[in-house]
């Protein structure tokens, strides 16, 4: 995994080694991916670059639309499992409760914006 301090787009306000649950999407109302990490910047960077082959790279799931910071990794894992068991509409409601426009939040944590899709 890319170390946060080696990250080429690091900004001083980036989230540093904090357990969190995050939701990525391919596009607004598109395919959703729920994950957990202790290094959000590095993990989202990996998803965006396709560094790790799998579900997100196969379906172009690269836009960060929600993340929740938690105190401990066990709490983050429990929250991830909880959200993964929710109905799709509940997940959409969760995203829209704080991000109704489905804006890519990755820019706010230090990553460059995604190129515009045609």
Language model region names:
Residues 58, 81-94:
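Short arginine-rich
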Residues 1-53, 57-69, 74-81, 98-100, ...:
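GIY-YIG nuclease catalytic motif and its immediate N-terminal context
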């Amino acid at each position: 995994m890319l170390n946060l301090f080696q990250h080429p787009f690091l900004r001083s306000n980036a989230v540093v080694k904090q357990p969190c649950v995050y939701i990525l999407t391919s596009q607004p109302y598109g395919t959703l991916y729920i994950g957990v990490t202790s290094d959000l910047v590095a993990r989202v960077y990996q998803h965006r670059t396709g560094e790790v082959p799998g579900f997100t790279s196969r379906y172009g799931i690269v836009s960060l639309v929600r993340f929740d910071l938690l105190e401990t990794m066990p709490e983050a894992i429990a929250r991830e499992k909880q959200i993964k068991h929710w109905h799709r509409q509940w997940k959409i409601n969760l995203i829209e409760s704080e991000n109704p426009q489905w804006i890519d939040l990755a820019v706010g944590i230090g990553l460059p914006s995604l190129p515009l899709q045609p």
